[in-house]
Amino acid sequence: MEVMNLIEQPIKVTEWQQTYTYDSGIHSGANTCVPSVSSKGLMEEDEACGRQYTLKKTTTYTQAVPQSQGDLEYQMSTTARAKRVREAMCPGVTGEDSSLLLATQVEGQTTNLQRLAEPSQLLKSAIVHLINYQDDAELATRALPELTKLLNDEDPVVVTKAAMIVNQLSKKEASRRALMGSPQLVAAVVRTMQNTSDLDTARCTTSILHNLSHHREGLLAIFKSGGIPALVRMLSSPVESVLFYAITTLHNLLLYQEGAKMAVRLADGLQKMVPLLNKNNPKFLAITTDCLQLLAYGNQESKLIILANGGPQALVQIMRNYSYEKLLWTTSRVLKVLSVCPSNKPAIVEAGGMQALGKHLTSNSPRLVQNCLWTLRNLSDVATKQEGLESVLKILVNQLSVDDVNVLTCATGTLSNLTCNNSKNKTLVTQNSGVEALIHAILRAGDKDDITEPAVCALRHLTSRHPEAEMAQNSVRLNYGIPAIVKLLNQPNQWPLVKATIGLIRNLALCPANHAPLQEASVIPRLVQLLVKAHQDAQRHVAAGTQQPYTDGVRMEEIVEGCTGALHILARDPMNRMEIFRLNTIPLFVQLLYSSVENIQRVAAGVLCELAQDKEAADAIDAEGASSPLMELLHSRNEGTATYAAAVLFRISEDKNPDYRKRVSVELTNSLFKHDPAAWEAAQSMIPINEPYADDMDATYRPMYSSDVPLDPLEMHMDMDGDYPMDTYSDGLRPPYPAADHMLA
């Protein structure tokens, strides 16, 4: 009956809502005009606390439900209890003369008496707050059952008024704790929010859940009551405040409530969130983007849903059009997570992601710069043909001068990928002192292979196949890089780094001016040592009949090919030829002619071609029985291999009898030179054959994926992001660090 009376008198409900802080009106039913708390005492209390409140008298009505004398006595005792406690503990708060606490006042100054009284005033204020806190909690606890019934009422007006009251209660900590301790009330709020078509009710109910979500108990209550699907539904609301409350509540759930991420995914939350990226409120977008990052991190299906709903394009637009740092940071975190997804990467690049991210590399926000660097690093393997990256490349070269390990790792990796098979980018980096900057980065990196390896790869790209390649080759020498580079051949450096270094040395040897410094750095003995070790390892597997395994992503046959190719170029110098010959390498080179790998046959024939220019070496080649395999190689499908073989045969047959020379000549004519006079001339005159090696094509980083990476701390309840672990290396572009994502710590 009491609830029915409240429904029949909306004006009374309104007045109750306005004055609920002091008397809910549900349990007392007192037919009285007495204020719930003495207005004079409360005003004095407010002055002591330095605060002001709007005071109203509370009138409750009991026309339909007469109240017993016992209920009235209970209400009077409850109302007076707080006042008695205040009077007992803080007489100055409720007395008539509290305003005269300090009569002596010098205008604009604090007297000594006032300063002495400050601690007691602070204590009095704390006690008053404690009493009020207890009052709020008791009030909310008494009101909960009745409020739950009102929220479940069939009359939408009653439901709206009840939602308003609960919303007010949820704004105070004590009453808020009472609310989230009632599963029935939270469930009623969720049910009301899900079923209402009234905008005010939707606003109040989402506000209630938003307030509760600031406590772990509240998050659990929302989660258990099925609040996540209801909140996802509210993301379609046309009311901005409802959208804000819904997205912030979901954000808190995603951050702190176990199981929330899966629940949001199952409720199609991603499909609702991605379109919200078209809103224009930066703070709203910052929370929305962080929700996307939390859902996409470590979950490939979520990344694909974001892609299917146009997420990459919208995120790139945000990076391009906004300047709010927190939004740019959260957006860059989403892009960083998506940048390890093979499907999302091309979409981000095609939307102009490289250029948009590059805009922020000079930002004053270190966390934004680092996220942009990681994302660029991860995208760079699919952006080798992108135009308009001139400013990005210049900034990356400048970034090589910093000492931050993450910055150096990203800058070197990105430069390595963007200079892969891109002559324009190679020339630009070379002309902007990129070679010098990379050498200095290598010198500072020490044993950090994740910096040294991509830096060496970038140098390898810059020293071949573009108009400024010779300039780059000379620049390495002029910046004292050769000794440091040769040292990288030492074990126990990782094989990927060793392989990249071998390729760089081969390119440096193309410049005659580099031969002497390379020799002084003892590069030839180191290359021969690596060649012997790699060949022995490869032969062991051949003898055992097992497949050649990868060591850190590198096959030993690749090391054999690289070392032999570098020695081939170095052997063009007479002093180097003599040193290679004296290291007793000819038996090994002859053995390599029998290799089943075509590229190894070619480089072995090439180095023998150079060595055979010296008679002593030519005799040694002949003595090792090289004629037979060389005759076979005359029929090779690789023209370079056949030409090298012919040149060696001509050289070693010079001292043979005429019959032998004639037989060799006939064989060469029939097999190789019948339709190629130029090759005949080349073989006879020992002109070096300069066809490109297999590794002349720039080798970039291969995809390296690892597990989820740590993320940067988010200051507005956003505590996650992605960082990137170490990856392995091999030839090929280096895509992202993780195949899962990054968490930023």
UniProtKB/Swiss-Prot annotation:
Membrane topology: Peripheral membrane protein
Annotated region described as Interaction with DSC1, given as residue ranges: 574-661
Segments for region (Interaction with DSC1 and DSG1): 132-297
Molecular function GO terms recorded: alpha-catenin binding; cadherin binding; nuclear receptor binding; protein phosphatase binding; transcription coactivator activity
UniProt subcellular location: Cell junction, Adherens junction; Cell junction, Desmosome; Cytoplasm, Cytoskeleton; Cell membrane
GO cellular component: adherens junction; catenin complex; cytoplasm; cytoskeleton; desmosome; nucleus
UniProt keyword Metal-binding, yes or no: no
Glycosylation sites: T14
PROSITE patterns the UniProt entry points to: ARM_REPEAT
PTMs per UniProt: May be phosphorylated by FER.
ARM repeats, residue ranges: 132-171, 172-215, 216-255, 258-297, 298-341, 342-381, 383-420, 423-464, 470-510, 512-551, 574-613, 615-661
InterPro entries to which the protein is assigned, alphabetical: ARM-like (IPR011989), ARM-type_fold (IPR016024), Armadillo (IPR000225), Beta-catenin (IPR013284)
Main localization category: other
Modified residues (Phosphoserine): S99, S125, S182, S665, S730
Residue positions, PTM N-acetylmethionine: M1
Subunit structure: Homodimer. Component of an E-cadherin/catenin adhesion complex composed of at least E-cadherin/CDH1 and gamma-catenin/JUP, and possibly alpha-catenin/CTNNA1; the complex is located to adherens junctions. The stable association of CTNNA1 is controversial as CTNNA1 was shown not to bind to F-actin when assembled in the complex. Interacts with MUC1. Interacts with CAV1. Interacts with PTPRJ. Interacts with DSG1. Interacts with DSC1 and DSC2. Interacts with PKP2. Interacts with PKP3 (via N-terminus); the interaction is required for PKP3 localization to desmosome cell-cell junctions.
Function: Common junctional plaque protein. The membrane-associated plaques are architectural elements in an important strategic position to influence the arrangement and function of both the cytoskeleton and the cells within the tissue. The presence of plakoglobin in both the desmosomes and in the intermediate junctions suggests that it plays a central role in the structure and function of submembranous plaques. Acts as a substrate for VE-PTP and is required by it to stimulate VE-cadherin function in endothelial cells.
Name recorded for this polypeptide: Junction plakoglobin
Source organism per UniProt: Sus scrofa (Pig)
Annotated gene: Jup
